[in-house]
């Protein structure tokens, strides 16, 4: 079931576009034809992916600081009205430009745990949009101690002439963790926490792209979105110099909710983050977004999206929403850059997983030697425990530039969020640097839409008819001869489809489905679903799409 919400762009409801000061660099955006059948429920084609288990992270000492302490702090804070206790920035750094802020560098030689662990921590100075103080503590042998601000840890360049006069309670804006991802001799950026509850994580051979969030509140709502902040962090010092899992805790706070978080980070080719969270609502909340992530999609291979004066064939950090439902069905929703705010919710129960995926890994499809969109990570969320009923919500926001995150995805619980009732959500998040090797069946590799030809329009007497072309590849499709009687199983809610064809492309070996879509009423929204079947067996994931884009 899909709930569709389409609205005019609402002032104040747009997504927060993470500022790129946290990164190594900035973005340096039917009459039915014989092939058409009613859409049955596709069978489960594989177990939930990826097959992973919670990270065996080292636990703090029984008498030491741990997740229960953060839960207690969050619960105590939720019992009181929200307060922003961050001290104002001193005049010397209160009005820094983006370029000035970028010039303030943490000295690598002063990194926390330098030469003591595989992990090192560098701190971000406050300034520019990152004006809130974040309290960062170190946990050693079970004891937590706040890290006191020291201006000598930073190279201010020409921005601050007398850094020694900055107050010692200035605090920090966030931090980043370094780890030898690529080679044993250099510690690369692994995970960054900077601004609100945003964080970014990398695996091997990946470049920063999309962003994860601790929590989303009322994203896309008419009253405007609320941005909770991670106000406090506790970084657990590794007890073994060769320890390969890092544990940290965080306290989240906002007008509506507080939260306690535990992150266990395991670096690798596919970096894995295990998240445990307990939320304490201060008041009833219209909509919570659990395991939220944001990304950028300006345009892809669809010619209908090429409305920009840009030489690059495609520009995006992610090109689709992928999900595996509680019944085992795999869904693929190509992303779009709509002309007005669009929100879709894919209803489900006990979801196996979802994520924003960068499926296209071919440099020639981007032609951007600076951005390297083919290296952007995909984030996949696998729930731990029973998340019950709810839905994966996809938010797509119009944008004319590739510097803004205009896509969001997250889980929305069906049960209302009520004051005083704690909520528990745990999940695994994976940062993939290449195309995930699931679903195991055929996958959508391209979606193209275009206006019907003049002849088709004349024959149909419908100027709003659209031609859809979908290419599938992978799984059992690759070994099929072109004479095999594959069927495209299609549904069109709000319209009908005609002129359906299925053919194997001789040059690529992929299978192409092509059809016309006619809205039931002129310019009405049409929800489409399609997958390929052979002798009653589903061979592909389910492609889902919405017109108009």
Regions found by a protein language model. Name each.
Residues 42-98, 104-107, 124, 365-549:
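Terminal accessory/anchoring regions of large secretory-pathway or extracellular enzymes
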Residues 10-44:
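Signal peptide processing junction and immediate N-terminal pro/mature segment
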Residues 2-12:
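Hydrophobic membrane-insertion alpha-helices, especially the h-region
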